[in-house]
């Protein structure tokens, strides 16, 4: 049976359209290049992600309210919500992460140095936008996160407070520069 040319053309058109709409055909869409952040071998990898717009803020309340016994006198911080689909789906509680560098008084340094683990080969993973706030001539000591949480009075259960709960995940202290580097997360109800 021979198909006339008039019947063959519509079949080819349908086949071409169906092939173009095939969901199983791999697409080579150009992907957006990630923002080129500075690289610094002093720091561990920063693992938190967000869809929020990031902006370094110069403030101490973000540190001192979440870490009550820190006593920060100056600081630079990034706070953002986790990438959790909350923009398209309501979530009653929003999990956030915080990373920052803060100046602290000698009393805070003394409390933490007594409980330190020792010299660190890599500094805690902080967001690359904060690298410039960590002078290269400062030496840091790692503090166990469980010890830092206990000594500094963080409250991982305070989700209903104004600032939410907070738990330190990585922490280092510099006695010669009176700086701390912190990364942690919490929950806002």
List the predicted regions and their residue ranges:
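Mixed-charge, polar/low-complexity N-terminal
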Residues: 2-3, 48, 52-53, 57-58, ...
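Extracytoplasmic electrostatic interaction patches
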Residues: 123-189
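Bacterial N-terminal signal peptides that target proteins for export
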Residues: 1-9
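C-terminal motif of bacterial Sec signal peptides marking the signal peptidase cleavage site
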Residues: 17-20
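N-terminal export/targeting and maturation segments
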Residues: 22-96, 100
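Mature extracytoplasmic domains of secretory-pathway proteins
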Residues: 69-150
